[in-house]
Amino acid sequence: MLPGYNPLLLTPPFAMIAFDRLPAKNDPRLPVLLLQATFVTCGITFWGFNRSPAQVGLILLICVTLDCLLHYLLRRKNLLVPISGLITGLGLSVLTNFSHGLWLAAIPPFFATASKYVFTVNGRHIYNPGLFGVIAALVLSDGMITPAPAYQWGGAGITAFFIATAALMLFALNIRRSVLISCFLLFYALQLSLRAWLLRHHIPPQTLFMGAFSSPAFYLFTFFMITDPPTSAESRKGQVFMAFFIVFVDLLLHKFQSFSTLFYSAFAYMTLRGLWLLWQNRSQYRNPLPALKQFAKALLLTGLIGGTGWGAYRLTHAFSADEVTFHFSEIPASQSGIGGTKGDIWERTDPRMQHVAKWLLSVGDAAAVADADNDGLPDVFLTQPLKSEQDRAQLFLNKGNFRFERFPLPQLDDHRKHPETHGLIASATWFDMDNDGDQDLLLGMGFGKGRLLRNNLKETGTLGFTEVGNGNAVDDYQISVATNVLDYDNDGRLDIIIGNVMQRYLPGYDRTVPYNIFKLPQPEYQGDRRMFNVMHHSWHDANNADENLLLRNLGGGRFAQIPNSENGFSGKRWTMAVATGDLNDDGFADLYIANDFGPDELYINEQGKRFLPVKGSFAGSVGRDTYKGMNATFGDLDDNGRPDIHVSNVHEKLQAEGSLLWMNYSKSGQTDAAMFKDEAARRNALNERRFGWGAAFGDLDRDGRLDIVQANGMADDAYDKKEAVCPDYWYWNAQIALTNPDVHGYADRWADVRGRCVFGFEANRVYLNKGSYFVDVAEQAGWNKKGTSRGMVLADFDNDGDLDSLVTHMTAAPSLYRNDSRPAGWVGVELVGNGQTCNRDALGSKVVLAAGDSPTGAAQHREVYANNGLAAQSDRRILFGLGGKGSGEVSLSVRWCGRGDTETFKLKPGQYHRIEQK
């Protein structure tokens, strides 16, 4: 069976009855139509279906229109009442999964409906249309479409509903397939027992059994799909053979760790059955010309329709780029001084968690850039949690010409030497905590208390750090990979937000027990498994991590937590990244929180009083995604004066979802979901067939538009290699994905990930912004290396006016790249607030380059951000590309944070300008 998929019968038992009049009240298709309409309606409103109303509408429109058209042209009957087309369309809306947008939604319904007229014997279709549509989409879409995941159904309680529904429908329709169902269930149980025994050393048997027999997908396949009378056996012996054949082929496919196994098994059976029917009716084809003529006519007509659609798609999706004018040249560690070697962190975790430590500790290799010593060059702090003791949590000072030297931070020695008791440093953010003119360092912690280091450069004249006192709100226990800062109340002091990615305290205990992957509690009674209840309880709506923390800056290095009941936050999502900036141009910093295993969260700042959660009504709208949000980055990609939002996601087998690109069309002060529209697919920034992580915005070729760099790849075997070719863990993950929370929510039910890979060798992307679309030019730009990347930093390390890059990796040393670009005009600005009405870092200040000075002919809009993006803080300075316009002074306007005072400046291009607020 396809792990994680929903093989729902798309065409019901009597779907091919051609009604030329309105159906009767006792038409058996009507209850099926009602049932599927209920599935779809609940799915896009309450459950976790990743289909928008527009996508569902398009699928239905194609099924109905094409069915009526082909019926009229090929069978020359009265106009068809398209009940079957509606049912097929609704079923495909349940079955298929793809990114937001409309073009992909057209593929399955076209092939599903066409198969009813092309592949026939004696005028009857041999393939279940929905099955054919799904198989065609899987084979032809190059991974852009997958069957919908089982977790879209929302939870274990729905399983009983589907079992009861299936039984009632079967009884009501009396389709005489009880032998088929009984034999299939028996054979599949035996097959599953065999697989569970063979795989017992890789995955707990309970996981396989409960994954299959508690999945709505399995019962939908059993009670609906294989019982379709036109495409299933009628005799008892035939039904026994059909059940055995499907289960046997399914077993063979699992031998090769295949996906979509039941789909392919059923398709193989229907193909053989169709050939058998042709053989049985061979006497009718002694003169094959009429049948061949009808087949050719159907094939030609459907080919003409499909070809027209394909041509229209290609015409509107012709993405191309001019010659790439820059190249990323990698700087070796021997020159840069920045490196990282393998550590022993996985082996130091609790022995009961070592089989999943690689999964749970797959995030946290972060980089943060700022000028720590005020010498004008960007310095780098690297967390490197999985690296050796001497490489973890190190500050590298920029000495020019891409040479860096380590600066000692003895305050962090306990974290380097004793992560079991002090935790792993997993995120970092530079900011001027006390508005004294130097950069302090906020450190997010995995399984430990947060740290805040005050920079004493301004006070002593020498770079050095001291710990901000214990008892501060920053000192709370954390499991965090996301920290950021913002002046949420515009008081001139930067506040802190900390995103927790897991539950900090173990549930089920009558006392507070911190969750520490290095040391779990011992069992207190027979069968005590509470310590393993640490995994996500849903694959699309997990709410069992922990609350995110908003800390108000009280001045003097003191921070106080604002309770979520007061700040407007809600839920306990698995937060991976937090982006902050003014999304609706009201002068206050808003928040976008990217969450794994569930919907992201958009919070609009209500004038510094609290945050308003914004959520759309249907899938495809902001706050209603079922994705695996990894990254959140703000920036104005279309220069309309509003920051857009880029969210990295997964686009792989089982999860054809991809990145979100929320284009901002808001009006000033707007606070509803209509502010944003996801245009990742339309703008060719989906990051298809990649496991996305961090991303950053910057004008790489200095043409006046913000480009996107994207980190990819989940887990390789660089630190735990066991076999010459790394086995794929995604297959085992798919078995786990079928299960209910009482299985996949417990770590001891997970398969062993050691020595296995999860999309571990993937190329990063460089998306050039061409105005209305993006083009990936990574290979032309010199990014040919494949691996697993996390944080993506853009910074001008050599101050030459183009953006260099630093990429972090969980199981490899950081990659440092110099941008070697052709000459082009540019101007850079570093803003400094007055520290009273506007914070010294000038976060939230907005800079506009006049349209007459921009090579695009449109004004360039930028905002000063702190730390937008997963595991990476980029250069805070703003760099404007001027293209060929770089000879005379350029005009910039600055709207300062806080009161919003505006100043205009005339600046000389080709250099950075430090602008201090009056």
Where are each of the predicted segments found?
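Beta-propeller blade termini
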Residues: 364-374, 397, 424-435, 454, ...
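Hydrophobic beta-strand segments that make up the repeating blades of beta-propeller
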Residues: 379-384, 440-445, 496-500, 586, ...
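Membrane-interface helix-loop-helix junctions at boundaries between adjacent transmembrane segments
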Residues: 77-155
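Gly/Ser/Thr/Pro-enriched helix-cap/hinge segments flanking short amphipathic alpha-helices
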Residues: 307-325, 336-337, 345-357, 363, ...
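Beta-propeller blade repeat segments, especially FG-GAP/WD-type strand-to-loop junctions
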Residues: 325-328, 390-408, 449-468, 508-518, ...
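N-terminal signal-anchor module of multipass membrane proteins
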Residues: 10-71
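Repeat-based blade/solenoid architectures
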Residues: 338-366, 411-429, 471-484, 544, ...
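Internal/C-terminal transmembrane anchor helices
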Residues: 290-315
